[in-house]
Regions:
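Positively charged n-region of N-terminal signal peptides that target proteins for export
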Residues: 1-5
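C-terminal motif of bacterial Sec signal peptides marking the signal peptidase cleavage site
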Residues: 14-17
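Bacterial lipoprotein signal-peptidase II cleavage site
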Residues: 19-25
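Post-signal peptide N-terminal segment of mature Sec-exported envelope proteins
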Residues: 26-46
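Secretory pathway targeting signatures of secreted, lumenal, and periplasmic proteins
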Residues: 45-97
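Second-shell loop/turn segments in exported
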Residues: 77-85, 137-138, 160-168
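Signature of long, low-cysteine stretches enriched in small and polar/charged residues
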Residues: 96-151
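Surface-exposed amphipathic alpha-helical segments
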Residues: 151-184
Length: 184
């Protein structure tokens, strides 16, 4: 009888010892690192010049608009240029309207005025927080001859958390474009 008890105890210990305990793995986070931006001066026949990230691909349009592509980030900056012809109020209103169309999905829109008196460049930078289609836009003008607006769009469903590293990188490029912009 003692042998049977010892045998049953050994079988029970063997069965309990053979169970593989599953340990849950922690959630992994995708780390997106982008190289430090290097900038080159961009100039063509259009009446505006600015610094451009050397990793970006720029395409000029006949109306002096530009698309700046970031293939690795699946994003594009769209720049449109318009001459001012007694229509500065309409141009400003349209640029502001474009930004505030995102208020439905945006958590917050931060306005940051921009003034460069030395080069006659005045404008507004908008940082759009939340799951809006764009997370940054700006416009600049000299109020008499030139008007330029700029926005970035990603080729993905808006999800601020997932595009935040790329959005932050491109937002810095947009600020550089705005701050280095000169009228010809």
């Amino acid at each position: 009888m003692a042998h049977k008890i010892i045998l049953l105890a050994c079988i029970a210990l063997f069965c309990m010892g053979c169970k593989k305990e599953l340990l849950p793995k922690p959630n992994g986070q995708l780390r997106l690192d982008y190289h430090e931006a290097g900038y080159a001066h961009f100039e063509n026949s259009c009446p505006v010049t600015f610094d451009l990230n050397e990793a970006a691909i720029i395409k000029s349009k006949p109306d002096c608009g530009f698309t700046i592509n970031y293939p690795k980030m699946k994003a594009t900056i769209y720049i449109s240029y318009k001459p001012v012809k007694n229509n500065i109020d309409v141009l400003l209103r349209d640029a502001q309207k474009l930004t505030y169309e995102h208020v439905i999905k945006a958590d917050d829109i931060l306005e940051q005025p921009f003034i460069n008196k030395d080069h006659n460049v005045y404008g507004m930078f908008y940082q759009v927080n939340g799951n809006a289609a764009t997370n940054a836009q700006f416009y600049v003008t000299d109020s008499t001859k030139h008007f330029l607006d700029c926005s970035v769009y990603f080729y993905a469903k808006p999800n601020f958390d997932s595009v935040m590293p790329a959005a932050s990188y491109i937002k810095n490029d947009m600020r550089r474009i705005m701050e280095s912009l000169r009228w010809k």
